[in-house]
Amino acid sequence: AYTPGSWGYIGGEIFRRSPGRIGTTAEVKDTRNVPLLQTKRKDIKAYRFDLPDGDYEVELLFADLNARSERVTYDLGAVATLDNADFRGSVFNVSVNGRPWLSHFSPAIEVGGNRCISKKLRIAVTGGNLTVDFEAVKGMTFLNGIKIFRIH
């Protein structure tokens, strides 16, 4: 969670593919960071970083984890059920420091299920913080990973 003077998420909850299990064992394609993309924060409101003013690159990583996936041989005891709502087909808006960035964005529509899609943006930070806001249009917002790089 966000802590003033530091960084963190605001709102949302951990994605659980089946009761008692964080994330999914499904293979996520189009990434070398499979373990990272097998988890996500769902219904996230924002991610905030308190950092020095300057130029930064923001990279957001998404993967819709609710598509049917192949059964994993080493995970024979897993129960392949979903709790809560089906998030496939979620559509949401993303803004950075109040500036609209991704409008009516849907990872499932762009690349399909269990596939990574990355979105990058360069931004000048003033006022000591960088905030990425998420707004649901249909379904829920979600985020699998975030990277922030300072550009010198």
Predicted segments, located by residue:
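Compositionally biased, intrinsically disordered or flexible polar/acidic segments
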Residues: 1-152
